[in-house]
């Protein structure tokens, strides 16, 4: 085993995975250290092929967990508090943290390979020029040392790799990017969007910009990623690799170089 590394990265979540990909593709011998357990992509910890009746209590956690104070932070986010995804989150009773009484903080963590990249919401929104200029115009803090124009090519670089499904909406407050086929709105969503457009010129209801593949590129399929089937089981892990995570995208890209340990 080679113990000489050019780069050592602590953590394999979204940031760590990206760092590993970029360093490995530039020829650096890279070591990634993860505090949590290994989670194999498409392995048994992914529950996306299990039917409701295959899950413990059909996905509802046991009442004793709440009674004994387990997963307090996660219980406040009810949509994630399910047995099919509980193992991807940290139990804050076992790993407590503190914060000032007047500044409560909900720290959602995942201690495993891929970290929170397995459970993030996948909404990918660019900052607009307004976001970079707002504090200077409002007189708060200091001006940003960079502007939107500096980041725009890097936004594009990331979007092309991860795959973002969205419309080009032409909004000043939300710049368009490198998008794949957008999801269609439901009839109810379209009805609301149309009525907002009739009554307001400065308010918009748009389809989300999600890091779920709808038209995979050759680069993405070469990594083993497939098209999203819209099953709404994302929190269980995606065996198709359709949503962006360290397991589905950046770490496989890093492994392909032969420079990752």
Feature map (PLM): residue ranges:
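Core beta-strand elements of the Rossmann-like FAD/NAD(P) dinucleotide-binding domain
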Residues: 2-5
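N-terminal Rossmann-like FAD-binding beta1-loop-alpha1 element of flavoenzymes
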Residues: 7-32
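Glycine-rich, histidine-containing beta strand-loop boundary motifs that form or position
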Residues: 12, 34-36, 43, 122, ...
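Short glycine-/acidic-enriched loop or helix-start segments at secondary-structure transitions
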Residues: 19, 42-43, 217
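Glycine-rich FAD pyrophosphate-binding loop
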Residues: 24-46
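Short, hinge-like loop/turn segments at secondary-structure boundaries
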Residues: 48-51, 224
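Conserved redox-cofactor binding core of oxidoreductases
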Residues: 56-91, 96-106, 111-112, 120-126, ...
